[in-house]
């Protein structure tokens, strides 16, 4: 006679980012305050017996599992962990303002486009004169993060080898694309190569700006 397996879709919790000294008992001790626990296990390496940095906890009911996943910054054994329902996988770590180091935000006067300029033309202050406009690739003018390479590097300090081995957790850092300032280079003109038209740049003098447009 076969035993019917209990559905643990909404009660089984994935716990990532665990310290390597975390054990089954210490993991259980953290989650028992949220309700009854059916199982708490830390995944270990078969050869070395050392923790892989993540584990699973199965709560007795759905309400207890929801309470356990509410804390956005759970601290287990002195380290910030990643707690979420197992079928959803690891929670993605959102980019905070701490990753904007070295990124200069745009002045609102340049975002409003009063002179018909496209969002791809911005003024990098302290780099060139205000009267010169250079083409700069910007993914989203509403986003304060222009240099995604810096954000990717800052994010990498939170990733561990344990997440690479966990099937639910994809590497979020791979989704960032680096953007930077690029200059247009015109190829040399030869007898066999026709002359390419010069790149058009939009330019206007700063004295044409009205004071009310810079507010």
Curated annotation (Swiss-Prot):
Keyword ATP-binding attached: no
Family matches, as InterPro entries: Nucleotide-bd_a/b_plait_sf, RBD_domain_sf, RNA-binding_reg, RRM_dom
Entry keywords, A to Z: Cytoplasm, Differentiation, mRNA processing, mRNA splicing, Nucleus, RNA-binding
An annotated Gene Ontology molecular function: mRNA 3'-UTR binding
Gene3D superfamilies: 3.30.70.330
Keyword Cytoplasm recorded: yes
A Pfam cross-reference name: RRM_1
Record's subcellular location: Cytoplasm, Cytosol; Nucleus
GO biological process: cell differentiation; mRNA processing; regulation of RNA splicing; RNA splicing
Annotated ranges, domain RRM: 11-88
Reported function: RNA-binding protein that specifically bind the 3'-UTR of some transcripts, leading to maintain their stability. Also acts as a mRNA splicing factor. May play a role in myogenic differentiation.
Name of the protein described by the UniProt record: RNA-binding protein 38
Organism the protein comes from: Gallus gallus
């Amino acid at each position: 006679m076969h035993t019917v397996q209990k559905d643990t879709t909404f009660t089984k919790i994935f716990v990532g980012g665990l310290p390597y000294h975390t054990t089954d008992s210490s993991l259980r001790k953290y989650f028992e305050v949220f309700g009854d626990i059916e199982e708490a296990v830390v995944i270990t390496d078969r050869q070395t017996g050392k923790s892989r940095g993540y584990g699973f906890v199965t709560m007795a009911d759905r309400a207890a599992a929801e309470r356990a996943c509410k804390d956005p910054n759970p601290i287990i054994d002195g380290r910030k962990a990643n707690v979420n329902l197992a079928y959803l996988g690891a929670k993605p770590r959102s980019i905070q303002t701490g990753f904007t180091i070295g990124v200069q935000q745009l002045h609102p006067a340049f975002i409003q486009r009063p002179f018909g300029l496209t969002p791809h033309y911005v003024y990098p202050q302290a780099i060139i004169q205000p009267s010169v406009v250079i083409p700069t690739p910007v993914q989203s003018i509403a986003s304060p993060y222009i240099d995604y390479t810096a954000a990717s590097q800052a994010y990498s300090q939170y990733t561990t080898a344990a997440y690479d081995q966990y099937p639910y957790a994809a590497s979020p850092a791979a989704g960032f694309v680096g953007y930077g300032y690029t200059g247009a280079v015109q190829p040399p003109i030869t007898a066999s190569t026709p002359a390419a038209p010069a790149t058009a740049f939009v330019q206007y003098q700063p004295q044409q700006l009205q004071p009310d447009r810079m507010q």
